[in-house]
Amino acid sequence: MRPLRPLLGPLATGTALLLALAACSDDGSGSDGAGGAGGAGGERSGATSAAEETPEGPAVRTDDSDDHADQVYVAMGDSYTAAPGVDPAQGDSGVCGRSQVNYPSLVAGAFGGSTLVDVSCSGATTADLLGSQQLAGQTFPPQVDAVTADTDVVTLSTGGNDFGAFGVLAGQCEQPGATCPTLDLATAQAGLARVTTDLVAVIGAVRERAPQARVLVVGYPQVVPPGAEGCADLPVDGELLGLARLLNEELVNAQQRAAEQAGADYVDVFAATEGHALCSDDPWINGSDFVEAAPYHPLPAGQRAAAAEVISALDG
């Protein structure tokens, strides 16, 4: 993992950049974009993916063994886990926007006989895994409350909504003629450090409740492309695009550090989604329209890619 390098002045960010990294909405619309990618791009460019690609995207294999039969699987996370807008929705998901074909559902479906408890919710921060979440006038209990002594597997993925500054920036920059605030390096570094610290605390709380459970931190996919050119769905370029990519990578590094420090497994979705960021020929991240997924969130193919990596990790 490369360290967060100096960023040539403040991280001045525009609307598309912030939406892609962490749109941080708390209105349940799914625009909370847990921004980020699953690892440092430079380190993982040669990594292999567990997903076999088809013309429709990655395939999710089924597991015919009894290794995971009767297991209880708890999924915790934000909208990148819940998958708002990826139809059909879970009947009880409400404003959290959980999909019946998000990666936790696909993983549970691949392991016949397992029980899924999906408490992921749009807008969730890492703090919401341990404390209650306020969303659209409703209060949701701490996600960790779903973990009990009989839980066998826990996946968790948060951090993209932890930067309160991103929510402020996205909200203000969306207004016509508004001046976008800036996020300085110290704020970014402190926020990334908190992501790691808070995720370590969550993993510890999970282990207290279910000492025997397998805990996996699921990294974010590649959202921002490498290079210096944006596109219609990400209309920034040059230095600004580079800063977005750097934050994309560093957020995931923070997730990976937490997994390593707490002795949990890390699922590298960043490597699995190489070549499928925004502006690519075959993006697995939705653009600005609410089509097939919430804006700037994983498309069904992105959910399948994450599921394939989780399945591979559990079978490893």
Regions found by a protein language model. Give the residues of each.
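Sec-dependent bacterial lipoprotein signal peptides
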Residues: 1-22
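N-terminal low-complexity, Pro/Thr-rich disordered segments
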Residues: 18-72, 180-184
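Serine-esterase "nucleophile elbow" of acetyl-processing enzymes
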Residues: 52-122
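Short amphipathic alpha-helices and their capping/turn segments at secondary-structure boundaries
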Residues: 57-72, 136-155, 200-214, 311
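Structural recognition of the beta-strand scaffold that forms the well-ordered cores
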Residues: 72-77, 81-83, 115-120, 152-157, ...
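Oxyanion-hole/transition-state-stabilizing segment in secreted/luminal serine hydrolases
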Residues: 84, 137-190
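Surface-exposed cleft-lining segments at the edges of enzyme active sites
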Residues: 181-196, 240-244
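Catalytic His-Asp segment of secreted/periplasmic serine-dependent ester chemistry enzymes
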Residues: 221-316
